[in-house]
Every structure is written in C-alpha cells, then in structure tokens.
C-alpha cells in the first residue's frame, strides 16, 4: 500500500531542507555567508559577513554599508550585494 504523502527521506526536496533548522537538515550547513557589497557613492566593493556584529563602513568614502541587527546585518538603502561563491 503506497500513500500519496510518502516522502523520500534520503533525497528530500531542496525547498523543504531550506526551511529546516540548520542542525536538523540531512547535511548540516550554516545560514550565514560572505557577500560583496557595492557602495552607492564610490562603487567600491567590500566583503562583508552576512551576520556582521559591527557597523561596516566603506573604506573609500566612509559611508555606512550595513548595520547589525539581532541576526543578519541590515544593508543600507541603495547598496547592492551578491553572495560570494565557494
């Protein structure tokens, strides 16, 4: 007897794995990452940690790029970012 709600536990869908806690995934992986942030004023690119606990300023024009919150850092309005690859 096969039920429609059967889920393959060895090969779960990626969407369901992303919703789980980082320690309860099939393969543990962190939620944090490094990112390249482009300054809106001088277009300098700075590498920033996603869960930064300090204010990050642009080395070129001293503009604040991101501010810490309780979890992920909040980017300043107008700054663009891209996730760094492995």
Curated annotation (Swiss-Prot):
Gene Ontology molecular function, alphabetical: structural constituent of ribosome; zinc ion binding
Zinc finger (C4-type): 39-61
Superkingdom of origin: Eukaryota
Free-text cofactor note: Binds 1 zinc ion per subunit.
Pfam families in the record: Ribosomal_S27e
Keywords recorded for this protein, A-Z: Metal-binding, Ribonucleoprotein, Ribosomal protein, Zinc, Zinc-finger
Keyword Ribonucleoprotein: yes
Assigned protein family: Belongs to the eukaryotic ribosomal protein eS27 family.
Protein name: Small ribosomal subunit protein eS27
């Amino acid at each position: 007897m096969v039920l429609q709600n059967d889920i393959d536990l060895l090969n779960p869908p990626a969407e369901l794995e992303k919703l789980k806690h980082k320690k309860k995934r099939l393969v543990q992986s962190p939620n944090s990452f490094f990112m390249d942030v482009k300054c809106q004023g001088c277009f300098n690119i700075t590498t920033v940690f996603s869960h930064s606990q300090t204010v990050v300023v642009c080395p070129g024009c001293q503009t604040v790029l991101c501010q810490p919150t309780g979890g992920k850092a909040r980017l300043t309005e107008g700054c663009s970012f891209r996730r760094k690859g492995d």
